[in-house]
Regions:
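Short, flexible active-site-adjacent loop segments at beta-strand->alpha-helix junctions, enriched
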Residues: 9-10, 82-83, 107-109, 121-126
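Core catalytic region of metal-dependent phosphoesterases/phosphodiesterases
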Residues: 2, 15-113
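Active-site-proximal loop/helix segment associated with metal-binding centers of metalloenzymes
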Residues: 11-27, 116-140
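Short, hydrophobic/glycine-enriched beta-strand segments
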Residues: 2-8
Length: 140
């Protein structure tokens, strides 16, 4: 068993937002990810997917991206990113994902070797220049 990590896939199989709008280097980015993933990752490996998996705004729009991810080899641990507006609740997302995808949201995922991955939302310190009233409620 090996552990890999990747983030910000920004897949768009369910919406019309190809990554190549950001430049020619992004042409075929999903194919490049698939080729690299499928040639390196085995069914015994685990992959931390650090958020921003899909450009979809709803679960329906993100579903083709989640299906694509489920087709990749290995066990995937998926955490919600700041662009994951489609991730409305654990129950709703769990209902549509492949068994090889494990959701991480204020919980933990134990891997077969005893490694435990813990996930929770990151909160910026209250003195951060971008902190706002919502952040203030967390600390007071």
């Amino acid at each position: 068993m090996r552990l890999f990590a990747i983030s910000d896939l920004h897949l768009s199989f369910g919406v019309d937002k190809p990554m190549d709008i950001f430049g020619d280097q992004w042409v075929g980015h999903a194919d490049k990810i698939r080729e690299s993933w499928d040639s390196r990752i085995t069914e015994d490996d685990w992959v931390l997917v650090g958020g921003d998996t899909s450009w979809g705004l709803s679960l329906q729009e993100a579903r083709p991206d989640l299906d694509w991810l489920g087709e990749r080899p290995g066990q995937k641990i998926l955490i919600k990113g700041n662009h994951c507006t489609w991730w409305t609740s654990l129950a709703k997302v769990r209902a549509v994902i492949d068994d090889s995808i494990h959701l991480l949201q204020n919980n933990a995922v134990a891997m077969p070797d005893g490694t435990v991955v813990i996930g929770a939302r990151l909160w910026d310190p209250p003195e951060a220049p971008w902190a706002d009233e919502k952040s203030e409620k967390i600390y007071n």
